[in-house]
Amino acid sequence: MTADELRRIAYQVPFKPFRVRLASGEQLEIARTLRTTVAEDRAIFGVDEDPQTRVARRMRMVPLREIVSVEVAA
């Protein structure tokens, strides 16, 4: 996945939740806008959302080369 491809998904208006599948088999659920920052070779995702505060509990820095696919919710 390229930085531009991920930016198009992460910053689309209106925002649509998406799932990032990593080479390790791990999946990251991105449910809200402004939870993703994309650089040229990596992305930072806000994950593990607190259901009461709706704040991400952790940040994950992922090299783009480790992203196998991204699925956008319908």
Task: Give residue ranges: language-model regions.
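Motif-centric detector for short Cys/His coordination patterns
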Residues: M1-A74
